[in-house]
A protein has these predicted regions:
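Class I SAM-dependent methyltransferase SAM-binding "motif I" and its flanking Rossmann-like core
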Residues: 2-54
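General beta-strand structural signal in soluble alpha/beta enzymes
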Residues: 10-13, 60, 86
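A contiguous loop/helix-start segment that scaffolds small-molecule binding in enzyme catalytic cores
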Residues: 57, 64-164
């Protein structure tokens, strides 16, 4: 490629997303890179819902001060057993890889002060395997009905939220 008569070439360099994907051991033949999730809650929830249903491995960047919030959201949307790996400070002196499932990662970071650049790798679900937490669904249904929704309206809302037809 030329720009103003000068040949341009691409020089490969470190990429946190790909480094985290490879080091996670999670499926890497097909993946989705989300980058940083939007701050606007409705947009965030839309993407989190997509991640919860996705069969492909998902890569996310997150800031240290927002990591705990994101992990809590992933727990809510994907369930605690979903495989995940949180990589911090890749290719640096204090590189760290934490993961097995969302429950364990949430517990690991619960009381920690988090610093550094963070990349999260989330395993996709198996085809046809929607991860629905029945306890959470019942709690959500109860909360919605206490807020004044009818059983029918609350059920329709939760079905849509969880991708159940």
């Amino acid at each position: 490629m030329k720009y103003e008569g000068i040949d341009l070439i691409c020089v490969p360099g470190a990429c946190a997303a790909l480094t985290a994907l490879v080091s996670s051991g999670l499926p890497s033949s097909s993946f989705i890179f989300e980058g940083f999730l939007p701050k606007k809650q409705i947009d965030r929830e839309k993407i989190l819902l997509q991640i919860s249903k996705n069969e492909k491995t998902t890569l996310i960047y997150e800031s240290p001060r927002r990591l705990k919030k994101l992990l809590k959201e992933l727990l809510e949307f994907c369930g605690g057993d979903r495989e995940i790996m949180v990589a911090r400070e890749l290719t640096k002196k204090f590189e760290e890889h934490v993961g097995d499932n969302i429950n364990e990662v949430v517990e690991f970071f619960r009381e920690k002060d988090i610093i550094g650049e963070i990349t999260i790798v989330i395993k996709g679900i198996k085809k046809g395997d929607l991860n629905i937490d029945k306890f959470s669904i019942k709690k959500d249904l109860h909360d919605l009905m206490n807020a004044g929704l009818s059983l029918s309206a609350a059920s329709k809302y939760l079905a849509k939220k969880n991708g159940v037809k």
